[in-house]
Design a protein with these regions (language model features):
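Catalytic core segments in nucleotide and nucleic-acid processing enzymes
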Residues: 2-101
Length: 101
């Protein structure tokens, strides 16, 4: 049902450090959280090259670490990085990545 969808933008419920001198530190802020399905999405304004498999398609290691932290804190297995379409990234043709846990 459409009314069951709760979408949060720039969600700020969690921090990387929950208690340091009784304060939260390093606030997490995924761009989109679909709560009823526990889906985390983060938008990136970077150029992806779907032909550059050796260079991880231009996906940064820092972005993958960030998504991993979101997976842990939100207890989510459905995580997406969203990139703009360019002449080197025309369709979502890159195979999914799976974290080695």
């Amino acid at each position: 049902k459409k009314s069951d969808w709760e979408i949060r933008t720039q969600d700020r419920r969690f921090s990387l450090i929950e208690s340091h001198k009784s304060k939260q530190k390093f606030q997490l802020r995924p761009d989109i959280v679909i709560q009823n399905e526990n889906i985390i999405m983060d938008t990136k304004w970077k150029i992806i090259d779907e032909t550059d498999e050796a260079g991880n398609y231009g996906i940064s290691q820092a972005d993958m670490y960030q998504l991993y932290v979101y997976a842990q804190k939100y207890r989510s297995k459905k995580l997406y990085l969203i990139y703009p379409q360019t002449d080197k990234f025309l369709s979502p043709s890159i195979a999914p990545f799976y974290y080695n846990t």
